[in-house]
Amino acid sequence: MLQQKKLFYGGDYNPEQWSKAIILEDMRLMKKANVNYVSLNIFGWASIQPTEEGFDFSFLDEMLDLLWENGIGIDLANGTASPPAWLVKKHPEILPVTSQGTPLVHGSRQHYCPSNKVYRSYVIRLTEEVAKRYATHPGIVMWHVNNEYTCHISECYCESCEKSFRQWLQMKYKKINTLNECWSTKFWSQSYSQWDEIFLPKEMPTFKNPAHQLDYKRFISDQNLTLFKAEKKAIRSYSKDIPVMTNLMGLHKHVDGFAFAEEMDVVGWDSYPNPFEEKPYPQFLANDLTRSLKKKPFLVMEQAPSAVNWRRANGAKSPGQMRLWSYEALAHGADGILFFQWRQSQGGAEKFHSGMVSHNQDTNSRIFKEVVQLGTEMSQLDELVGTNYNAEVAIVFDWENWWALELDAKPSGEINYIKQMRDLYTIFHELNIGVDFIHPKEDLSNYKLVLSIAQYLVTDDFSAKVKRYIKAGGHFLTTFFSGIVDEYDRVYLGGYPGAFKEVLGIYVEEFDPMPIGRKSQIKYGETYYTTELWKEVIHLQGAETIATFTEGYLMGQPALTKFGYGKGKTYYMGTKLAKDGNMKFIQTILAESKIQPLNQVEIESENSKISMTCRSNSSHDYIFLLNYGQTSEKVKLKKGGQSLLDGSMVEGEVSVKANDVKIIKLTK
């Protein structure tokens, strides 16, 4: 498996778009930029299999040899991300179909149904040919399977999917009556007597059965995962030891990242923060989430050197922004930074997506200078490879809950899983408190504090695990509309939140969501804090009121609560707080959980813009100091160390310039 010794630096390379002269110039420029790793052949299917009858590997042979001769490692893709025109012409049944029954034709990308057996047969044939030919090539560092599963096709309603869905359901439930019970089909006369009576949840007159919808989302994720596993198996027939991976997309809803990570040897994701955001917290969150999928270092497989091409306004990254955000990923556990793509395309749908080498081909351009600077710096940081990121706080992240939470017919259609996550994650990031994300099946005992945010769907196993964790002394925070249903979207009876009611010392009688734009307030101590989106009628059953609602029939009633359970404590948020309220509540919980920021560095400014994290190994701590402010800031080291980016020894007060970074190596 992967024996990585250097931080990877490079990007997607698509030499099939360019002349021989430009390709040779690319080798020179890659060396100048300290590129040591590229992804190759991701969209190469039509090039290496121009017709069904035969393969032509001559160009790919040449490229692998050329890259290897120039000291550049290769993440070689099997090329299955975009089926060629000849395949679609011969087998139009491989095309994905919308819920309205419209096939999506060739001329874009990802135009395939993941469950279609014909498509899969051609995928396996191609993958086997690629793996057989290049399994022993010395330049291959990693195998790259497909590309961004479900990025564009997150649903398919073709006949193949319908047949596969019925088989999937039969495997899961065994008996049709079991499905009827789990799907609550007595409601609206939806009961089934035969498996072939079940259709995909296509267009319907009104609200669909949410259990039906939820299983369909599980099915789609599973179909893409089994496709990945089939492609991986084809590679493993010829290559036993080289790692196999694909590029995930961080906060992407439609495939279960934890399930994919179990099958991947290395985890990577494609990071595209919005340049108009000073601190793009969703991307920061996604770095921590991606690392957490395997609790190991990860790779940023794609990011833009500057602008992308697919937003309504595709702003350029300001000077230094790309560098700072790259270090944000490194600070949170990345062992490589890659771009899409090396050279900006001359034509095609992504020609205005920035590249490491721009249309102007000017090596004195700002973008290329920043690319060279980052590559030069990263070449000096190889000792970071494999270092750990440790956290005392865990946030539960569950794709199945995400799917269930955002289905139709909820008390509020405005509950957004990622926004709820982001609101609280932001507080930990600003307080310089490290966070892991965990699957509900993972052990909770490694953490002092566990958050279960908008955890609408809760299994009996997770509920029991939470009870054991708190009884043993853990601290647990959950938020409104959590613990409501089981894995079949059936409500726990006896008062909300049924799965957590005992450990919280409360029950919720009724939800009272607020319309968009309406604000309210709670009283927390002697201070009033703004709330929105949600209120509810909370009854205490042993819990203590921390804050109260201040308006209407809920005036004086609990909004935030605390409860001692066993040796631990639980906290409940019955409303959505603005940032200052979240900050107050989280700081209180951290103090009671005895969780503090890194103790090696003291930040002097009360309103500091410094983000501080630590990676470590058995002998050293590596303190990352990223200044997101517009002015220089000073921090105070508790003991002296080495500044890795310039090699100098530092102690006492250290200044970090605006939009800049320092990495301090401290001996343990």
UniProtKB/Swiss-Prot annotation:
Q: What class of enzyme is it?
A: hydrolase
Q: What EC number is given for this enzyme?
A: 3.2.1.23
* Active site residues of this protein: 148, 302
Q: Name one GO cellular component term.
A: beta-galactosidase complex
Task: Provide the protein name.
Answer: Beta-galactosidase BgaB
Q: Name one GO biological process term.
A: galactose metabolic process
Q: Which Pfam families match?
A: Glyco_hydro_42 (PF02449), Glyco_hydro_42C (PF08533), Glyco_hydro_42M (PF08532)
What are the protein's GO molecular function terms? Answer: beta-galactosidase activity; metal ion binding
Q: Give the superkingdom in one word.
A: Bacteria
Ligand binding (Zn(2+)): 113, 156, 158, 161
The annotated dependence of activity on temperature is: Optimum temperature is 30 degrees Celsius for activity with ONPG as substrate. Loses half of its activity at 30 degrees Celsius within 1 hour. Inactivated at 40 degrees Celsius in 10 minutes. In the absence of glycerol, the enzyme is extremely unstable even at low-temperature incubation, with an 85% loss of activity at 20 degrees Celsius after 1 hour.
Give the similarity note. Belongs to the glycosyl hydrolase 42 family.
Q: Which UniProt keywords apply?
A: Glycosidase, Hydrolase, Metal-binding, Zinc
